[in-house]
Amino acid sequence: MMTKVLGMAPVLGPRPPQEQVGPLMVKVEEKEEKGKYLPSLEMFRQRFRQFGYHDTPGPREALSQLRVLCCEWLRPEIHTKEQILELLVLEQFLTILPQELQAWVQEHCPESAEEAVTLLEDLERELDEPGHQVSTPPNEQKPVWEKISSSGTAKESPSSMQPQPLETCHKYESWGPLYIQESGEEQEFAQDPRKVRDCRLSTQHEESADEQKGSEAEGLKGDIISVIIANKPEASLERQCVNLENEKGTKPPLQEAGSKKGRESVPTKPTPGERRYICAECGKAFSNSSNLTKHRRTHTGEKPYVCTKCGKAFSHSSNLTLHYRTHLVDRPYDCKCGKAFGQSSDLLKHQRMHTEEAPYQCKDCGKAFSGKGSLIRHYRIHTGEKPYQCNECGKSFSQHAGLSSHQRLHTGEKPYKCKECGKAFNHSSNFNKHHRIHTGEKPYWCHHCGKTFCSKSNLSKHQRVHTGEGEAP
């Protein structure tokens, strides 16, 4: 969600205990080897969290230094209040997770607390599927972190679920989070990136001796994936293991319950860029479960991210963030008609109304549209496609917005409430029309005479006087 540094997504959660982190793990890019070292968001977070009072001559200096460190981490000059809040909530959420899950979630680099929850729910569903069930006393529900331990790693201590120290730096480069020692070494590496390169070079001679220990030192990621994959039914196992045949390292065979024979060893560390998560609807594959979850919303029409200001809903948190800026910041992109926008792309779409530019044309009737989405929705008129069906009465709709509005007839829900007078509405368009009564906004502009209107219907009535179809109101 925020910033990617050194080619890796920042890990916002707490760092595992120092003795479990292992040697310094830093991914070095070519430009860094030339002398350009870019500090990570995680490093700034740790500097802020681990700052000590004894490092300053007095309380005022300590407070001043804390403010500087906090700004370096949260970057309030570029991040919104909501982004900063989400960062803090995600950090605390990862802090309260059991150790068995904490580092596993960090491995997937969630962009928000909601995405971290989705990862855990996906993992829990994996473990609840047939073939993953572990015998438990009646009426006792085990949490997901206990299911992980009992479904394949019960013989291992909780500490074994944490990433194990490796003898070389490069083994974590493809998927490990960026951890920087908070000591004098940090300053040395920050001032001279060549030391990072020396660290990597000095360990290359030890690789041959470490290869036999690699399966035991793969750490948390290998343990979790082996538990999930090894316990799946055979049909699902074949699907999950696509493109894993070329993996070098394998985990020792796992013993099945009640069986003396161990299962065949399966690859545990996925190949970089491998797409193991497959959509059941269209077959599209993804490299992590969070991207699959986002993709599924294109089929379900789900929009879980709702703007608290106007009630508009979005399928992705990033789209909500962009939208929310329209409520918080100035709108620097002005149109000659006086309407302003927070993004240049919105201004371009709006200007097509003045120029009558409509680059997207329907092949059946020739009608043109300014946006591709409008053309897709229009085309369903010709095909008769109505993919959105109401579960209550079976009525179908060509657009998800139509289904959402219809479902409120069953529930009686009116989520759009006016803060000025308290009146509630079941549809955002009705709410927006009403809200213009209070603001006096008239966003619909006649390009013939320049007169403005508060609703599109009033503009259409007015334009008839120019086309000769009727008189203006």
From Swiss-Prot:
GO terms for cellular component: nucleus. The keyword Transcription applies. Residues 127-167, 244-272 are annotated as: Disordered. SMART domains: SCAN, ZnF_C2H2. One of its GO terms (molecular function) is RNA polymerase II cis-regulatory region sequence-specific DNA binding. Pfam families: SCAN (PF02023), zf-C2H2 (PF00096), zf-H2C2_2 (PF13465). Residues 258-272 have a biased composition (Basic and acidic residues). Residues 45-127 form the SCAN box domain. Belongs to the krueppel C2H2-type zinc-finger protein family. Strong transcriptional activator. Plays an important role in spermatogenesis; essential for the progression of meiotic prophase I in spermatocytes. This is Zinc finger and SCAN domain-containing protein 21. It comes from Pan troglodytes (Chimpanzee). The lineage of its organism: Eukaryota, Metazoa, Chordata, Craniata, Vertebrata.
